[in-house]
């Protein structure tokens, strides 16, 4: 289990660094590596010791080659089988357990994405350990920092488990360099198929806009837009900025946009170079998902809106006038 750590305990563990070894579970789409995996590798490197990556899937040779070049990775373990199609946690867990049994890793981690949040609790349960979720900082090999109360407080936890299983908030760690490494690759330990689930199909929505969690610019709308049709104002602005479009929980709950656009504690965590909040009041739940953005611009007609407390630039005005004006100015450039 884990408990709150006393300040004096944070100084220990320097002598343990040489004994650390970490397994990063790579998230990928067979031909491309998920960006959050690079952030997770950086976090794993903070623990000291050797960092290995496990790649499971089908026809994922390109991902293996890319990971071998990533700085900080010592070894890439590869498991290619039809059972790993779709990266189902029911199938990946036995593989991870066999890998852990053979190599005795002290830490197992993945990005705190839907993939990692779905997989790691199952792995931890099978190992009979308590996982630590969504960490934002590593104090020492057994001490981690995560947010609580919708990001309003930080909790430092000391994990005494024999194997530390944790997920990493990608926005809190820089991405590892995609070149400069020279890791070796080898076949991962074999494991039997669980046989309790089967991957059938996946249909991805195609968009010319960047993916929300990886975009450098994000334009988000809230309940102030009043309808889903009015989100076209944001789409037009986003097209000029080559930006992704997000939304507050209030906008999603109102049915303006689908829930995969939600930014916030119960949605997606983003940290773009530029975040433009349009018609968003700034509820705690939303701020928890975007407050790490490099530059925040808020547009709201209410000067007392909480969003202005975290914004670098604020525009107190009617969004239905300001947003079209911004779009027209950008079109002329």
Swiss-Prot record:
Its cofactor is FAD. The keyword Ligase does not apply. It is found in: Mitochondrion matrix. One of its GO terms (molecular function) is oxidoreductase activity. InterPro entries: DHS-like_NAD/FAD-binding_dom, ETF_a/b_N, ETF_a/FixB, ETF_alpha_N, ETF_asu_C, ETF_asu_C_CS, Rossmann-like_a/b/a_fold. The modification N6-acetyllysine is found at residues 59, 62, 69, 75, 85, 101, 139, 158, 164, 203, 226, 232. The modification Phosphothreonine is found at residue 93. GO terms for biological process: amino acid catabolic process; fatty acid beta-oxidation using acyl-CoA dehydrogenase; respiratory electron transport chain. CDD domains: ETF_alpha. GO terms for cellular component: electron transfer flavoprotein complex; mitochondrial matrix; mitochondrion. FAD binds at residues 223, 248, 263-266, 281-286, 300, 318-319. PROSITE patterns: ETF_ALPHA. Residues 1-19 form a transit peptide. Heterodimeric electron transfer flavoprotein that accepts electrons from several mitochondrial dehydrogenases, including acyl-CoA dehydrogenases, glutaryl-CoA and sarcosine dehydrogenase. It transfers the electrons to the main mitochondrial respiratory chain via ETF-ubiquinone oxidoreductase (ETF dehydrogenase). Required for normal mitochondrial fatty acid oxidation and normal amino acid metabolism. PANTHER family: ELECTRON TRANSFER FLAVOPROTEIN ALPHA, ELECTRON TRANSFER FLAVOPROTEIN SUBUNIT ALPHA, MITOCHONDRIAL. Belongs to the ETF alpha-subunit/FixB family. This is Electron transfer flavoprotein subunit alpha, mitochondrial.
């Amino acid at each position: 289990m884990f408990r709150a750590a006393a300040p004096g305990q944070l100084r220990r563990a320097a002598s343990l660094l040489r004994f650390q070894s970490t397994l990063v579970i790579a998230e990928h789409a067979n031909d491309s590596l998920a960006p959050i995996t690079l952030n997770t590798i950086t976090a794993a490197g903070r623990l000291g010791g050797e960092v290995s990556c496990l790649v499971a899937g089908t026809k994922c040779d390109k991902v293996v080659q890319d990971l071998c070049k990533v700085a900080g990775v010592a070894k890439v373990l590869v498991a290619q089988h039809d059972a790993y199609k779709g990266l189902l946690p029911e199938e990946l867990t036995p593989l991870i357990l066999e890998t852990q049994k053979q190599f005795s890793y002290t830490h197992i981690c993945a990005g705190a994405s839907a993939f990692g949040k779905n997989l790691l609790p199952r792995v931890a349960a099978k190992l009979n350990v308590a996982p630590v979720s969504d960490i934002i900082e590593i104090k020492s090999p057994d001490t981690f920092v995560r947010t609580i109360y919708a990001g309003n407080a930080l909790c430092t936890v000391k994990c005494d488990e024999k194997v530390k299983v944790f997920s990493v908030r990608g926005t809190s760690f820089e991405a590892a360099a995609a070149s400069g490494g020279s890791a070796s690759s080898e076949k991962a330990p074999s494991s039997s198929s669980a046989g309790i689930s089967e991957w059938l199909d996946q249909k991805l929505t195609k968009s010319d806009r960047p993916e929300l969690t990886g975009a450098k610019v994000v334009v988000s709308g809230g309940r102030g837009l009043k309808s889903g049709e009015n989100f076209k104002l944001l789409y037009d602005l986003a097209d000029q900025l080559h930006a992704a479009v997000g939304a507050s929980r209030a906008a999603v709950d109102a049915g303006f946009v689908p829930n995969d656009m939600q930014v916030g504690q119960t949605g997606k965590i983003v940290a773009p170079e530029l975040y433009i909040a349009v018609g968003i009041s700034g509820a705690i739940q939303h701020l928890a998902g975007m407050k790490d953005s490099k530059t925040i611009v808020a547009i709201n007609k209410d000067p007392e809106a909480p969003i202005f407390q975290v914004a670098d630039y604020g525009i107190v005005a009617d969004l239905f006038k300001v947003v079209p004006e911004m779009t027209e100015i950008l079109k002329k450039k």
